[in-house]
């Protein structure tokens, strides 16, 4: 028997005995083809096996890209609805040059052919087999070929790990807008991203029906996917030239919500110490739910998928066997039956006693975070995007709509249907221009502010205040620039997600129609993020960007035409949501509350509605205080 045959036999036996899996010929090279991998700058030895990426030139600089690296076994069949299982090491060289699958989700097709919508839809094959990650490395970093050997070539650099948004129901790391080649080319950082399970595939929670310690439907599987990917990247950072102790998470919307959980959860605290949260924190109303609510949604899904929900108490495994036999498309469609209205997603992080042992703000308020730094922020018009989609009969994408006062009230009642009449009336009073009550265009602006403040800006402010109080070093930005070539109607302003293309450097792509000031803004944001990942501060000492505290809520303005420092943002509106409304809610159950409610309702039904907001809110304050006596 020849030496090559003996070698192949030996490797095969080792693979079977040690639990190694042989990838297909399509994804790996044969043993004889990788004997000289140490001389190949595009081959890296990871803890899972060898990977080969590809090289591209970006803005005159070379970037090495690795896409589609598996970090977990495919969560299919018996692994559906369970925590991710680490990938078995492979033999050969993995071809890391192809974009991975996107996790199962539904496409948004409200405006067919509209690029502003299509840019957020998955651009690769949709599959349950989706747990892969991507890495971008500046070529000037000498890639080493083993994760455990120290480098003698140059200092290791920070690693930025992107977590995409999409309300925990949609999104994919493969979107063009998330291509991190420009960040890698212009900043001395490595960038990575991962896929994680969405919707019921990532958040179904029915664990109470199984014995303690069971791995069945534990909830938050999508977050566990993220954790496994972060740990893989941390374990292999040095092999790519990165510093495993300088890892910063950054993400938008649900990505920001996820990051805030990883920073303070008892499971992941200490895994990373820096996070950048764009338009999303874990305390936002759309970013978490109770275990009881998650169970209720899970039962509805079981029934809608044709499985026997009555068996859950005594034969839960039979129920899950049935659910694992349901095709993915059916689950993906039926889960939306529990959508509860604007930003009322049926799958979110769940308070399940492990990753989220209690209410997010209780977790934050009870912790000590003096060794952590966070950078977070909001956009100027966070609410208009969601307002358009959920009330599409009321608004036009391309131009302003005259919102009748009656429809304004209808939208308030719909969004806040679970609040008392008194609370809803208070919202109307706070968000009314009393000098122009019947100006439909102002009503449209006000309702957009309601959505943006309640769901995004004010939860972000609240998180920042409490985090600072518990020792975190907090930096806040406010993105106020409307892109010169925005595809959305001008009335929508600076919408949710508008900052993402600047974060990833797309204005520096000269084939796109950005102006020179927007290119400068993008470069400034990338530099701020890279400096934050390196030093814990987003700017150099000669730039004024003060820390954010409750007493001094100062933020840095990101705008192509002006920069500066502001306070808030939206300080008055957020005082209403974060301070006043909870007090009103606490006292609305008293015997006198109906009197207040009746009085306010009479004012509300008045044809004039001319009480100024200061007067009306003072009346509510007085009556609330009287009720508390």
From Swiss-Prot:
Signal peptide annotation: 1-38
Organism: Leptinotarsa decemlineata (Colorado potato beetle)
Name of the protein described by the UniProt record: Acetylcholinesterase
Annotated glycan sites: 125, 308, 418, 509
Catalytic residues, chain numbering: 253 (acyl-ester intermediate), 382 (charge relay system), 496 (charge relay system)
Assembly with partners or alone: Homodimer; disulfide-linked.
A Pfam family the protein falls into: COesterase
InterPro entries: AB_hydrolase_fold, AChE-related_enzymes, Acylcholinesterase_insect, CarbesteraseB, Carboxylesterase_B_AS, Carboxylesterase_B_CS, Cholinesterase
């Amino acid at each position: 028997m020849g030496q090559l045959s003996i070698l192949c036999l030996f490797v095969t036996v080792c693979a079977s005995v040690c639990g190694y899996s042989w990838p297909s010929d399509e994804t790996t090279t044969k043993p004889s083809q990788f004997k000289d991998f140490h001389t190949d700058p595009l081959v890296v030895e990871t803890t899972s096996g060898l990977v080969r990426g590809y090289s591209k030139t970006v803005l005159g600089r070379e970037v090495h890209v690795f896409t589609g690296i598996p970090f977990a076994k495919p969560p299919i069949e018996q692994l559906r609805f369970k925590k991710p299982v680490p990938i078995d090491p492979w033999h050969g060289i993995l071809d890391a040059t192809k974009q991975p699958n996107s996790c199962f989700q539904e496409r948004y097709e409200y405006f067919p052919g509209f690029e502003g919508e299509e840019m957020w839809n998955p651009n690769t094959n949709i599959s349950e087999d989706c747990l892969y990650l991507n890495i971008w490395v500046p070529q000037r970093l000498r890639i080493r070929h083993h994760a455990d050997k120290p480098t003698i070539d140059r200092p290791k650099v920070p690693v930025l790990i992107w977590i995409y948004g999409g309300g925990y129901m949609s999104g994919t790391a493969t979107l063009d807008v998330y291509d991190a080649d420009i960040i890698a080319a212009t900043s001395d950082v490595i960038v990575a991203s991962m896929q994680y399970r969405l919707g019921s595939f990532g958040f179904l929670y029915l664990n109470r029906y199984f014995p303690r310690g069971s791995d069945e439907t534990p909830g938050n599987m999508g977050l566990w996917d993220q954790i496994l990917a972060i740990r893989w990247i941390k374990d292999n950072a040095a092999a790519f030239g990165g510093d495993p102790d300088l890892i910063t998470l950054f993400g938008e919307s649900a990505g920001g919500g996820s990051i805030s959980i990883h920073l303070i959860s008892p499971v992941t605290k200490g895994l990373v110490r820096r996070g950048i949260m764009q338009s999303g924190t874990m305390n936002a109303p759309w970013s978490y739910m109770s275990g009881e609510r998650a169970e209720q949604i899970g039962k509805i899904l079981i029934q809608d998928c044709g499985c026997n929900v009555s068996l859950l108490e005594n034969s839960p495994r039979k129920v899950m066997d049935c659910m694992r036999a349901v095709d993915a498309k059916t689950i993906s469609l039926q889960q939306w039956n529990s959508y509860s209205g604007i930003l009322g997603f049926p799958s979110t992080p769940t308070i399940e006693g492990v990753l989220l042992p209690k209410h997010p703000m209780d977790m934050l308020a009870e912790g000590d975070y003096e060794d952590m730094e966070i950078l977070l922020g909001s956009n100027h018009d966070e609410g208009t995007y969601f307002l358009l989609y959920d009330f599409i009969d009321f608004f036009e994408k391309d131009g302003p709509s005259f919102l009748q006062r009656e429809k304004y009230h209808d939208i308030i009642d719909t969004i806040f249907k679970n609040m008392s009449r008194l609370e809803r009336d208070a919202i109307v009073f706070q968000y009314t221009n009393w000098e122009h009550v019947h100006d439909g265009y102002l009503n449209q602006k006000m309702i957009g502010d309601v959505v943006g403040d309640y769901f995004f800006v004010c939860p972000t402010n609240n998180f920042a205040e409490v985090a600072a109080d518990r020792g975190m070093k907090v930096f806040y930005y406010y993105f106020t620039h409307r892109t010169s070539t925005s595809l959305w109607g001008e009335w929508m302003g600076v919408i949710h997600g508008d900052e993402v293309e600047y974060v990833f450097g797309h204005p520096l792509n000269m084939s796109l129609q950005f102006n020179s000031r927007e290119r400068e803004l993008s470069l400034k944001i990338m530099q701020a993020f890279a400096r934050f990942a390196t030093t814990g501060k987003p700017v150099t000492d000669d730039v004024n960007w003060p820390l954010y505290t409750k007493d001094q809520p100062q933020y840095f303005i990101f705008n192509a035409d002006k920069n500066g420092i502001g306070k808030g943002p939206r300080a008055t509106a957020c005082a209403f949501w974060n301070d006043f409304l909870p007090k009103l809610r606490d006292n609305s159950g008293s015997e006198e509350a109906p009197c207040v409610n009746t009085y306010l309702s009479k004012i509300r039904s008045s044809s004039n509605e001319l009480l100024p907001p200061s007067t009306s809110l003072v009346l509510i304050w007085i009556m609330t205080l009287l009720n508390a006596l």
